[in-house]
Amino acid sequence: SRIAIEVCKSNPEIIYARMVRNDTAFCNGGQQISGLYKSMDGGDNWQQVITDYNNSGLPCDVLGGFGWYFGRIGVNPNNPNDIFLLGVDLYRSLDGGISWVRATPDWWTYEVHADKHEIEFFENGDILLGTDGGLYKLRKNSTEWEDLENIATTQFYRVAYNPNNPSYFYGGAQDNGTSTGNAQNINNWEAIYGGDGFLPA
C-alpha cells in the first residue's frame, strides 16, 4: 500500500491524503485508489471524502493498477477545494474531492500524454502538468492544454537512419513512441507511432 499526502500551501491546516490498496478482488485488481481523506486541522482529524465511487465521477481504477507508480495529489493554493488526482489520466474536483471530472482528454488520444506525475500552480491561474511525454500548460479560464514542445529531453533507446537520405532519422523512446525528422531541422520532427518506440529500423 501507498499514501500520497499534499498540504495546501495557502492554508497548511488543510491536508489531503490518498490511499492505495493492492487487492486482486478490488476494482479490476492491481494497486488501485482505496480512499481519499481530508484534514482541516493540520492532520489531527481526518474525514473520508469519497465513500461511493459510483456517484463521485472518479473511477476506482483511475490509477490503472499502478498505484505504486502514481502518487501525486495537486491542491491549488489559490483555492484549496480545487484538487487534482494524477494517474494515467488527470481528474479534477472543484468541491474538495466530492465530485470529479476528467481534466484532460483520454490518454489514448495523445492530446495530453498518459502518465501524469507532477503539477504546479501559478499565481496568475496558469497550471503546468508534467507527464512521461513532456510538459503541458493550462492557461487560466481555459480547458485546452498546450503542449510545450521543443524541450530537448527525449532520450532515444535506438536511432535508425534512411540510407537513401542519411540526414533523415527515426528515434524510438519509451512511452513516447517513434519520432522522425531531419537532423538539420530538429524543430519539425513528428511522432509517427505512439506507445514504446524502442527499436526503429
Model-derived features with residue positions:
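Beta-propeller blade termini and top-face loops
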Residues: 1-201
